Amino acid sequence: MIETNTFGATTIAQDDYKMPELAREMNLAAAKLAKQACDEFSTPDKPRFVAGAVGPTPKTASISPDVNDPAVRNVTFEQLRQAYKEQVEALYEGGADVFLVETIFDTLNAKAALFAIQNVCKEKNIKMP
């Protein structure tokens, strides 16, 4: 299993660097590179697979960024779902065989990532483990 280097490659995460428009390209390129490596070293006895990494964002849907106002949120579930959906689509297009949702400490963010994966799989009729 080769994991893509896309841990922080969502539009939300890349917005901190003023590069949200590059998120799709990052995911697509990372998946293609991982797929090339898998293809190069796969054998019938030892197949290799691409795990598209889907990681946390710097914004959380469950935790307030303002200790003085615990009701404040700096991102919505829908914004997270859409950002993860864009990431998952590009990872799949680039050759990801599975998606690895990792180290997302906010369970609502993780739920958005899982919903995005479900949405993409349903829309594209993808069957994945």
Language model regions located:
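Domain-level signal for soluble alpha/beta catalytic cores
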Residues: 1-129
